[in-house]
Amino acid sequence: MLFHRGQLQQPAHLNSRSYPRPMKRLEDVKISTLDLVPVRHDKGPAESLRNSLNLAQHVEKLGYNRFWVAEHHNMDGIASSATAVLLAYLAGGTSTIRVGAGGIMLPNHAPLVVAEQFGTLASLYPDRIDLGLGRAPGSDQMTARALRRERSGSAEDFPDDVTELMEYLGPRTPDQKVIAVPGSGTNVPIWLLGSSLFSAQLAGMRGLPYAFASHFAPRYMHEAIRVYRNHFQPSAVLDKPYVMLGVPLSAADTDEQAEYLATSVYQRILALMRGHSLMQRPPVDSMDGLWLPHEREAVASFLGLAMVGGPEKIRAKLDVLLEQTDADELIFTCDMYKHEDRLRSYEILAQVAHG
């Protein structure tokens, strides 16, 4: 990983312009948005939630396929903890874009409750709701205990919990004693999410779409895709594998501006690693003096798939990514400090991807 003026640079293989034509053309790949609903250090969650809706409306007009938010707890810089409640707000303020959880951390919840929540959403907003499931707690162990109280759920229960949840959302069977109302028969589309090979294998064996968390854990991306595709079994949901990759985004009109705006993201990841506040900080001219060499390398690893640059650089990197992965869909997260910069970043991406 190379650096310039204290900022992150892409690995050489993503900077190269001499590469084969991708198996999929970027114009044919769906693009989506993952909003972490970031909270600024000088603002509060209320503005973050309003900005999330505004962003959803913005990308809907730009033709994005879906808008997801993720469950996180006990993090002062992320306002999407009440995920199902937030999704109702987002779906009610939009009209065509799919909205969903990317994802619900199933160890934190009883499958029946999740089925009822998302069954309600699907009843209110038919054919627009997605349910992505993760097996991590989305928090520290102390917070996980606070969420579960007397319950003993764990990641080891995840496969069985997924099965139970799918049964609640599917058609009622004659011998079914517990039903989700709303929920039963809604068949809310379920995705499996993950940053490990476990979730990749499970998604393949269940014939479910798979979203890999390459926006923060790119190290195992290629292996996870291979495992998912190799283990895929056709199902009532899918007849062939479907892979969506998470991608960090910092697009601007020039490469220099994009690199400058990305320093807010670098500071946020650095704070996460140090156990400090995750509230957003304004960009800086240089990260020199803010991180130690080993921290710089750790942030670089965390954001190894980040797309930072102007339109031409973003396009070149995305073409390489598709050539390497043959992904079916890309979902982008953009944590810029100013809301208007985030809006512009998604505009540039839409122009680059679909003209």
Residue ranges, per PLM feature:
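N-terminal beta1-alpha1-beta2 module of alpha/beta enzyme domains
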Residues: H13-T94
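Acidic (Asp/Glu)-rich catalytic clusters
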Residues: K24-L26, L87-S95, A122-R128, G204, ...
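Flexible, glycine-rich active-site loops centered on histidine and acidic residues
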Residues: E27-P45, P107-G170, Y210
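Active-site mouth loops of central-metabolism enzymes
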Residues: D35-R50, I104-P111, N187-G194, F302-G309
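An alpha-helical appendage that flanks or caps ligand/catalytic pockets
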Residues: R21-E27, R145, R151-I179, Y220-A327
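A conserved active-site cap/scaffold subdomain adjacent to cofactor or substrate pockets
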Residues: A200, G204-F216, I225
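Hydrophobic faces of well-ordered beta-strands that scaffold small-molecule active sites
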Residues: I31-D35, F67-V69, V99-A101, I129-L133, ...
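Conserved, mostly hydrophobic/aromatic
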Residues: I31, G63, E71, L90, ...
